[in-house]
A protein has these predicted regions:
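Feature marks proteins synthesized as precursors that undergo proteolytic processing into two chains
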Residues: 1-198
Length: 198
């Protein structure tokens, strides 16, 4: 791919971009890659704060994250040798008899673990196929109570909650499912993504 660097840095082009639509606040990327030999990579990367650490590796143009920002001078996240900061970056791979059944990942910050459980529950307990499990309305427990996407019948709920339109901003998931030896890939309708077979 030839990148038109001169055009992208042209002051007239940049002036035309000012005041236009702004991108979202997403800084997390998840991808799953599988080959015909059964190898699978389920990977997640997040800058954390906007522009991450503000350090970009010059040769490849990779901006480094600042996940260490959650360290503190005392308490459970105290800086110490061989310690990792609190964060929610995680992916999920489900195996059965040594064979991959599912690989799943999602953006969504502190909601990520809840989303993993919700989608896995949709598949295992409710018998949904992977596409329906990812697309299903979500409910997530947040600092301000429950966040519930349209599609649930909400009656008699005594805890504080907020209904949001479907599809909501509850994270963007991608999934690979191995069904009878056929790999199914799917990318969530809640954001930009793609499922490609090559």
């Amino acid at each position: 791919v030839k990148i038109p660097v001169d055009r992208l840095l042209d002051p007239e082009f940049l002036k035309g971009r000012l005041g236009g639509p702004r991108g979202g606040g997403g800084d997390t990327t998840y991808f799953v890659v599988a080959d015909s030999e059964g190898n699978v990579v389920s990977a997640i990367q997040s800058l954390y704060y906007h522009f991450g650490s503000l350090v970009t590796e010059p040769k490849y143009g990779i901006t480094l994250n600042n996940r260490a920002a959650d360290f503190s001078m005392s308490g459970v996240n105290e800086v110490a040798p061989r310690k990792r900061p609190l964060h929610t970056l995680s992916t999920m791979m489900v195996m059965r008899n040594g064979e991959l059944e599912l690989a799943l990942g999602t953006s969504g910050a502190h909601y990520r673990p809840q989303q993993h459980v919700l989608m896995l529950t949709n598949i295992v307990d409710y018998g949904m196929n992977p596409v329906n499990a990812v697309n299903a309305p979500r409910f997530l427990w947040g600092i301000d109570g429950l966040i519930i996407e349209e599609g649930f019948e909400v009656t008699g709920l005594s805890v504080r909650h907020r209904l949001i339109k479907y599809p909501g901003s509850t994270g963007v998931a991608s999934i690979l499912a191995n069904i009878n030896g056929v790999k199914i890939l799917y990318s969530d309708v809640r954001g930009d993504g793609a499922a490609l077979g090559l």
